[in-house]
Amino acid sequence: MPSERGFRVHPAWWVAAVAFVALLAAAGFRAAPGALMVPLGEEFGWSTSVMSLAVSINLVLYGLIAPFAAALMDRFGVRQVVAVALTLVALGAGGSVLMTASWQLLIFWGLLIGIGTGSMALVFAATIANRWFVKRRGLVMGMLTAGSATGQLIFLPPVAALAETAGWRWASLLVAAAALVAVPIVWAVMRDYPSDRGVLPFGADPATYVAPPRPAKGSALSAARRAIDGLVFASKHRSFWALAIAFAICGATTNGLIGVHFIPSAHDHGMATTVAAGLLAVVGVFDILGTVASGWLTDKIDPRFLLVAYYGFRGVGLLVLPWLLADTVHPSMIIFIVVYGLDWVATVPPTSALCREIFGEQGTIVFGWVFAAHQLGAAAAALGAGLIRDTLGTYTYA
């Protein structure tokens, strides 16, 4: 896009593009659990609830690390935090090929990948959008949020195919390789602030723009204290609790329930794993469209109205899903996949915008805590659905 300097691309867009690549690479694991649970269960005899526990630990850390990661990015730099995070994802995914016991699954899938993905979750996207853009913030937030969906779209079919043809270990190595490839790209291009590139944020008016003060560099302890202070500050506002509860429901109904258990549930109904993985990939396609469109709408419409609409559509979709699962894909399932895909994380841009609008300079860290609620909801749904499946023999009541 043209910038204030003529027809050259503003550096903000290059930074956003690299952030998209990093989020895409980290999203490789988001595609993995649903596709790998069946082969892991067949090889090791692990129950669905045990594997769901590992995913739940991952999802909890993915959320709880986020507000601290936002503070760490302020203290130590975005590039440093993201490079370490991608390395942890690679170690967790690559190390999992050596597993022989279920407790090791908790370490690799749960601890390492949970910390890695949590350190560059949606607070990373919010940090880039808020620091590098004055105009188009909502659109950029939508585009970066879509990075995870694009990762799911790209990784899910090959992960499922590799797990079925070459074995789950090769699928895990694919995820590890993708994370490692992104590290040098992030290190070469990513910078903390527009002033590091000698420019203003995209869309800033040179006559009126005043750069916000940079947080003082400090220790990890001071960064953690800043994250806790953000929670204490936000918890005194009813708006925070409304956003957190709504986002917890969002996490439960996406990452926790559908993201983890859709493929095993479809497999229970006789559908091939690769077919179910293909359907989730289609969710990823429409998620990209829905999230980018949601970002554009967030710049133009009251975010509160958007959230009411998004949650309403999602509730209707979940009510009808148990009657749509079968051994083949019917037109009604395609309709569900399209609608659910458009709605998947369309909630993120308006939620981030409301955090920025209500909490000002603390908005990014507060959004980190709201996102933590999202992942707590996801973890509860992932574990709960696994327990229901093991206890009742069906996902219907999940």
Model regions and ranges:
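Hydrophobic core of transmembrane alpha-helices in multi-pass small-molecule transporters
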Residues: 24, 92, 104-120, 248-249, ...
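Extracytoplasmic gate region of multi-pass secondary transporters
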Residues: 33-38, 232-294, 348, 381
